[in-house]
Amino acid sequence: MQKISDTLKLIITAGVSIALAIVAFFLGYLYRKKIAEKTIKSAEQEAQRIVEEAKKQAEAYKKEATLLAKEEIHRARSEFDREVRERRAELQRFERRLIQKEEMLDKKMAAVEEKEEQLNQKIKDVQKLQEEIELLKQKQQEELQRISGLTQEEARQIILKSVEQDVKHDVALMIKELEQQAKEEADKKAREIIALAIQRYSSDYVAENTVSVVTLPNDEMKGRIIGREGRNIKTFETVTGIDLIIDDTPEAVILSGFDPIRREIAKLTLEKLILDGRIHPARIEEMYEKAKREVENKIREEGERVVFELGIHNLHPELIKLIGKLRYRTSYGQNVLAHSIEVANIAGIMAAELGLDQSIAKRAGLLHDIGKAVDHEVEGSHALIGYDLAKRYKETNPDVLEAIGGHHGEMETRSIYNVLIQAADSVSAARPGARRESLESYIKRLQKLEEIANSFDGVEKAYAIQAGREIRIMVKPDHVSDDDIVIMAREIVKRIESELDYPGQIKVNVIREVRAVEYAK
């Protein structure tokens, strides 16, 4: 019974708990529902409030935008009205100007018409005068024929001859004036081109000697060079062809000879013998052969260097070798290779200024004295020898060939490059310090120059100036006429060319001055 009672209690307790749970759930549901309804209502109210505020704000924005749009429309309309007023005013001004121009044109047209009428009247008057003149001329001719007994054709021929003489005189004066003007312009342009070439090209130059000095380690070496009974020095001079001068100069000997190549070979031979220390005839010949090969290599290398520096291509190897030989040639103390390089550069600059081919000018300038490399071995002038050598070694450019053969006037040429080479050659040779000559021969040449000038009849005074490059001659005006001075200048030039040896050219300037003096009392 006790167990049943406990079971019932448990059941009742469980039932009460379930009932309480159901009641609590229901009450919680009702509470949550009420809370949810209250929240929803509050959210709806808030949403309504936000919507109302948004409507109010949108209305305010709408009013503000409308106001701004109205203001912009008003401003645009005002701007448009202002532009329209300005355009209208501008059109009115333009219209007024057009009206003024039309009025001016009308006035000018009226003036032109008036002048045209006056001109027509003048033309009529002139025609009338011409008719009267023709009538008078006809009457005059008839009267002249009656008085002179000449026909009209005969009188016409006399007048034409007179007019022809006057016209010839005027034409001669005009031609002389134009020739003088052209000559002055040409001289001016030539001076400008030559001055520019000289300014753009500058080179160092040292005059060459005809002797070479070899330094010795001590004076005892002189005895070894001479050898027993002079056999070493004799062998040396025989093999090299150069004089070996041994004097009192301490620790030095002198090599003398007119051929610079042989002198250079002899110098190298002697230096090698001194360095080796063994000096006897067989050794001299051996060292001579070595020195000769070295100089030949130096000649070839020198030619190749010069050709490369000047940018000249397609030269025959023998011509390159001859160019290198020019390093050991001199003319009035001036190194011929240095002179040829200088001529090539100056001619190239002048050719560029004249719009000519610079490479042809440089090529002709470098080769113009190529004949001097062999002119002591071959008969003839160096210009013609050089011309033959260039042709032999496949130089085909006719301008280059003519410049080589004709740069001293020994053959007739038509090439402008020949004139360029002559000018560049004269510039290189004539500049101060380029060439030299002994004082004695220089003074004798100046004296001879003045003697030639003074030997002509009518010469009052003659002065050699510009270091003998110009002779200025004053003649007696009562003995020599203007026509005679031209002939005299030409005769003096011929005498100078036939009797004097000189570098460059000599200008012969014959001056005839006439003075008339009167006194006013």
Swiss-Prot record:
Residues 336-430 form the HD domain. The keyword Nuclease applies. It is found in: Cell membrane. It is an enzyme of class 3 (hydrolase). Coiled coil: none annotated. It comes from the Bacteria. The keyword Transmembrane helix applies. It is a single-pass membrane protein. One of its GO terms (biological process) is mRNA catabolic process. The chain crosses the membrane at residues 10-30. InterPro entries: HD/PDEase_dom (IPR003607), HD_domain (IPR006674), HDIG_dom (IPR006675), KH_dom (IPR004087), KH_dom_type_1 (IPR004088), KH_dom_type_1_sf (IPR036612), Ribonuclease_Y (IPR017705), RNase_Y_N (IPR022711). One of its GO terms (cellular component) is plasma membrane. Keywords: Cell membrane, Endonuclease, Hydrolase, Membrane, Nuclease, RNA-binding, Transmembrane, Transmembrane helix. Endoribonuclease that initiates mRNA decay. NCBIfam families: HDIG, RNase_Y. PANTHER family: RIBONUCLEASE Y. This is Ribonuclease Y. It comes from Caldicellulosiruptor saccharolyticus (strain ATCC 43494 / DSM 8903 / Tp8T 6331).
